[in-house]
Amino acid sequence: MLLQNFSNTIFLLCLFFTLLSATKPLNLTLPHQHPSPDSVALHVIRSVNESLARRQLSSPSSSSSSSSSSSSSSCRTGNPIDDCWRCSDADWSTNRQRLADCSIGFGHGTLGGKNGKIYVVTDSSDNNPTNPTPGTLRYGVIQEEPLWIVFSSNMLIRLKQELIINSYKTLDGRGSAVHITGNGCLTLQYVQHIIIHNLHIYDCKPSAGFEKRGRSDGDGISIFGSQKIWVDHCSMSHCTDGLIDAVMGSTAITISNNYFTHHDEVMLLGHDDNYAPDTGMQVTIAFNHFGQGLVQRMPRCRRGYIHVVNNDFTEWKMYAIGGSGNPTINSQGNRYSAPSDPSAKEVTKRVDSKDDGEWSNWNWRTEGDLMENGAFFVASGEGMSSMYSKASSVDPKAASLVDQLTRNAGVFGGPRDDQGQSGNSYSPYGGDGGGGGSSGGSSGGGMDVMGGTTRGSSSSSGDDSNVFQMIFGSDAPSRPRLTLLFSLLMISVLSLSTLLL
């Protein structure tokens, strides 16, 4: 009997260690979480510096080149995203999907509907959320296949319920003035590879829910358990909850070139200090204009790594950047202009923290930021990690260039929207990259095949493609399955029981 128990124990222990080695390395990383976030921040800074250098080299004062070169120089602003898609040889409207090659930061590589069909929105109605009409925006976003969604004309879309968007979709408002408002607005839940570009989003209200869904919060854009998300060149204001909220293990996000006005709680990144997966949240916030009538949360962070770079903060009433739960905040090359209220000069706020003993080890960094009207940033934590020391050897461009880098923030080519919306009007795109009005698809509300490449291939990569392939390798191990963890636990219990017999 003793020999049999001993044999069973040996068998169970062997099985235990075999399964344990199969799960090695055991980790809880999020999909698309980058193993070295400081290296991503470094690459963003390099991209800005290189784009500004190219602009300088191509300027008429430094070159006597051809008219095409002069045209390119008039297009370039030094903003690496805009220079990528606006300043190529071809008109952007003939190659809309080049936009997918132009993201930077943690959202780099977001495909959206790249290499998918073009879907043209011709119907601005939202009469039947449960069975949407072909030609409506809702019909396009619920399709399973990759789609590049464009709009046939200027339109105001009043949503009756939240707009739930499936993976591999691009909402491309270029060439038309597209306004989205109403109940729920945009919801990205457990999806990947979404690009939201050049839309007015405002006055979003909570929706009662439909089918089996509960009540929505009234966010402009709600990102829930999703990865590879890029929000670019949107104008947002006047929503019930947040303008952009990212929670529940969302990561690999870039929020760039947007124009935010007239709102209280602007941006939430992480919903609970105790939600451990949000430690893997990684967000780049770049080239945005935080304008009139904003109060707080630009952003408000929990856990994770947030890179705030070359933004223009022109107004806040409480604070600009807040956090709890030990997030890493890397602020570089921003302009912070404090309000006149002497009690609101501090850029930062450690939310719900009683004393500095609680947050003194949080890594909140400031480098190259411009502080105006008495603004000040309270840094904390380690001076620099080894990688961050390396990153700091590449200076972030001075905040004095923020005007230049954010000059086109918000809906591109439209009027600056200091009142929160600008009506259903459209101003043609300026510069050499413009070609207003082209929808890029058929006039009908259906789908038009575009190209013959497959999803995931790159038709027009930039000069930095090799670097990005190196930085954004897919070497992160997969998450362990709960069934496997439960099996390990049961084997341990059985082993212990056998030993005690």
UniProtKB/Swiss-Prot annotation:
Biased composition (Low complexity): 58-74, 450-463
Residue numbers binding Ca(2+): D217, D241, D245
Any single GO CC term annotated in Swiss-Prot or TrEMBL for this entry: plasma membrane
Membrane topology value: Lipid-anchor; GPI-anchor
GO biological process: cell wall modification involved in multidimensional cell growth; defense response to other organism; pectin catabolic process
Assigned keywords, A-Z: Calcium, Cell membrane, Glycoprotein, GPI-anchor, Lipoprotein, Lyase, Membrane, Metal-binding, Signal
Effect of G140D: In pmr6-1; strong powdery mildew resistance, cell walls of plants are enriched for pectins with a lower degree of esterification and an alteration in the H bonding environment of cellulose microfibrils
Catalysed reactions, semicolon-separated: Eliminative cleavage of (1->4)-alpha-D-galacturonan to give oligosaccharides with 4-deoxy-alpha-D-galact-4-enuronosyl groups at their non-reducing ends
Function comment: Susceptibility factor required for infection by most powdery mildews, but not by unrelated pathogens. Exact function not known, but clearly affects cell wall composition.
Family of the protein in this entry: Belongs to the polysaccharide lyase 1 family.
Other known facts: Pmr6 mutations are pleiotropic, indicating that PMR6 plays a unique role in normal plant growth and development. The increased resistance in mutants is not mediated by the constitutive activation of the SA-dependent or the JA/ethylene-dependent defense pathway.
Protein name, entry field: Probable pectate lyase 13
